[in-house]
Amino acid sequence: MTPPSATGPAPVLLAYFSRPGENYYYGDRIDLEVGNTEVFANKISDLIDCDVYRIEADDPYPDSYDETRDRNVREQEENARPVIANLIGSIDQYQTVLLGSPIWNVRPPMIMSTFAESFDFTGKLIHPFVTYAVSGLGSTDETYAELLPSADFGESVAIQGETVTDSGADAEAWLRRIGLLA
């Protein structure tokens, strides 16, 4: 995680989960060195002053698309809470949280539920961002509203994974709409 800002207003936290490896790509598969959500998170962090925290599974997800899909289905069926490696100690200093993930089977991966339930988000402004192959935002807004009933929610954004490398203008426009970029 990048260190918190020493001066100025409460910093923004950009917390995201991303998986490199074999990914869906226009009906086929492609191997990614950097996951799509991380690519978009980097575009955001290049544009605004924020603290960046990458959510990582204690038991990493496989590089194989099929194995990851199967594990995700099991986790969703079991309502699992995968353990996060190196969970940050606190989010108290943040008023705004940009919460990023891929969409797996129409919702954020279950590790995002682990993260959401690990902290008190009361009064914090949450702006979800996701990358997807088919489902757009899926049930992202509903999922987080259920997990974080005491949080406030701003605009979400969904970026197609296949186009994420060209999404700089999308990141800039979204950050302007939510008031984080002048």
Task: Specify the residue positions occupied by each region the protein language model found.
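N-terminal beta1-alpha1-beta2 submodule of the flavodoxin-like/Rossmannoid cofactor-binding fold
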Residues: T2-Q95, V106, R176-A182
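Structural beta-sheet core signal
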Residues: L14-Y16, V52, L99, P128-V130, ...
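Short, surface-exposed alpha-helical segments at coil->helix boundaries
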Residues: V34, E38, N42, P109, ...
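Hydrophobic pocket-lining residues within nucleotide cofactor-binding pockets
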Residues: I55, I103, I159
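Helix-loop-strand module that forms the ligand-binding subsite of alpha/beta enzymes
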Residues: P60-D152
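Glycine-rich phosphate/pyrophosphate-binding loop and the adjoining helix
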Residues: D152-A182
